């Protein structure tokens, strides 16, 4: 008989690698890189010339947890709208510039916190870097070198045949070296591709070449589901390796959805304070309640909460009681009723038609009792719930 020595389990290794050490830059009031929290960005979809609509969308993004917002600037009329938008926006504004270098200077003069430049399509960009560096330095404006697979320099496409990770990295490193030749260092870099595998490798190569802060993004990621999967896959790999200082989830969906997904990715990796989390079973033939409807009603009813609260909505007696006990608050449903758990203890059993009402009331009561620190986490010693 072969003996098996079970012994003591090995000490668990950290899931995430230490954060990559980079220089720090500022995008207005938001630090990017070094020890700054990883920020979430989005981009408005309104015409920038429609100042009121753009500011309204920025306000919605801010409320959803967006840290930095980007606005398009394809024309002089858009450039003329930037001063008001930059002044009235509650979060730092970055102007997105393509083709015309004059709009880089217009954005700097308008008071934007940052400018994104695309070296692949701005006319004679390399010749413009000295002037851009001086103007940005004088105004305290940071730059993003935004390399994109869809607009890569033709010389690199000829060299590599297509937008490979090496081509994206080489473009970024070249442009970074030109800015640094003019003693400008207040920039971050992105190397975006619509294929997450190519994008991941490009960022890994770039991270090996310098200490620049990196803006993560999968370009043209697609509709909500597809884009979420692509971004979560790519960001999860890179962030777990300590690579990435600010993120933008690109979706063919309202920009607020980009922010929600971005925040969820960071929270799932423990890189942003946990907030409301709904745990619900996928449902199966054992379910004795409409779990989909129940979970959606609870999620909608608690969407206003910003405290770290885990709520479990379970549809049967197999995993239901265990999951509900592990959550801060939960329900295990069956036989036309639901057992309500708080901190692992059953506090009451209610009829099925009262489950949602009871969970919402209990969750709000628990949220009100929480005392949170400046990072949105429970204060030690305060009357709080314990996360499962």
Swiss-Prot record:
It is an enzyme of class 1 (oxidoreductase). Pfam families: GcpE. Keywords: 4Fe-4S, Iron, Iron-sulfur, Isoprene biosynthesis, Metal-binding, Oxidoreductase. It catalyses: (2E)-4-hydroxy-3-methylbut-2-enyl diphosphate + oxidized [flavodoxin] + H2O + 2 H(+) = 2-C-methyl-D-erythritol 2,4-cyclic diphosphate + reduced [flavodoxin]. This is 4-hydroxy-3-methylbut-2-en-1-yl diphosphate synthase (flavodoxin). Its EC number is 1.17.7.3. GO terms for molecular function: 4 iron, 4 sulfur cluster binding; 4-hydroxy-3-methylbut-2-en-1-yl diphosphate synthase activity (ferredoxin); 4-hydroxy-3-methylbut-2-enyl-diphosphate synthase activity (flavodoxin); iron ion binding.
